[in-house]
Amino acid sequence: MTDPDSSGFRRTVELSSGQRVTLRSVEPGDRDAVADGYRQLSTSAAFERFHTLKPELARATLDFLTEVDHRDHEAIGAVDPAFSRGVGIARYIRSEAEPTRAEVAVVVLDDWQGLGLGRRLLEAVRDRARDEDVTCLTAEVMSDNERMLGLLRAMGPVSLDRSGSETTAHLPI
C-alpha cells in the first residue's frame, strides 16, 4: 500500500517507538500492495489473521479486501511514510442479519508488531464503525492468539465465547 491521495479517512499517529505512520482508507488501487503485504507475513501471522494458509491471496479475495464501500465494509491501512509501504490493515464488515454489529479484523506486519500499531488501527476502525451506527464489534480469534485477545481486552469491556480452537470476542462500542 503506497500513500497516494485517497478519499476518506486519513490520520497520522505516533507509535510507542516514536515512529509516525499514516492511517488511511484502503482503496481499490491498493490491491497489489495488499497482495505484497500478505506475502511479507510470517506463516503464524497469516494463519492467526486468515485462519488458513495460502501461498497467495486469490484475485477475488484481493478484490474483496480492497473494494470497500466505507459504510458496511471499511478498511483502514497503515502506511510507513519513510518507505511508502503498507504495514498493517484493520477492517470491519457489517452483519447483514444484525446491522448494528460488525466483524473486525486486524493484521500487522511482523516487524511492526509490539509498537501499538494494532491498537491504533483498531481504534480507527472502531471510530469509523461507530460513525456508521455500529454498536458492537465482534472478532473471530484463534484461542491461543493472546496478543489479539489482549488487544481486544485493552479496548474496553469485552465478552469472550470460546469454542475449541476459536474464540469469539464481543466488544461494545
Predicted segments, located by residue:
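Long, contiguous binding/interaction regions
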Residues: 1-173
